Amino acid sequence: MYKLCKTEQSAQRQRELERGLLAAMSSHQYEEISVSDLCEHMDIPRKSFYRYFSSKDGALHALIDHTLLDFEAFPAIRKNGEKRSNQTDLERFFRFWESQKPLLDALERSGISGILVTRSIDHALSDVGTPSRFLLQREKEARKQAITFGVCGLMSMVLSWHHDGYLLPAAQMAELAVQLLTKPLFSGSEFY
């Protein structure tokens, strides 16, 4: 776990430590990194690390969770007063994850991209995440299942897109996602 910081200075220091972990993950697999190595590399005492995180996993979870929170501030690009739509929202989503290439590289290198998916679902189901307001008229379990389906699908697209080297532009990825969300998944009577 990690500390929920109460001051801006404390939050900045915590993010600095998270960036240190990400920097270490850019050249080493996550499992190879120890708290001692990380502290030595950042020239800080172990006590400083443990002031913010209970473990290395806590630092990783904080890094991912704070990245998810950064999405809220990520700017949307709309042309000529274009109104908000599924297409523009999803294009923003894919552009955001394209900008997070160093994190996606580090997670993939260490074989722990699944943690991003799990934390993304948890974030979406929390009161903090925008998707938590999705389908408010439905019972909690139905919302949970719908949100899990949507987040898993979108994050799987992001991870595959990243793994393949971003061969399609974000706008085209958004278009594909909109089609998946708005068109029948199965066609023809052979499926019925």
Residue ranges, per PLM feature:
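Basic, helix-initiating cap at the start of DNA-binding domains
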Residues: 1-27, 32, 37, 41
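Amphipathic alpha-helical linker/stalk segments
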Residues: 26-27, 33, 63-89, 104-105
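Amphipathic alpha-helical packing segments from all-alpha helical-bundle domains
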Residues: 111-137, 141-156, 186
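Helical hydrophobic small-molecule/effector-binding pocket
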Residues: 83-130
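Short hydrophobic/aromatic patch on the recognition helix
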Residues: 43-53
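Residues in the recognition helix of alpha-helical DNA-binding motifs
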Residues: 20, 52, 62
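C-terminal peripheral helix-coil segments that are non-catalytic and often amphipathic
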Residues: 160-192
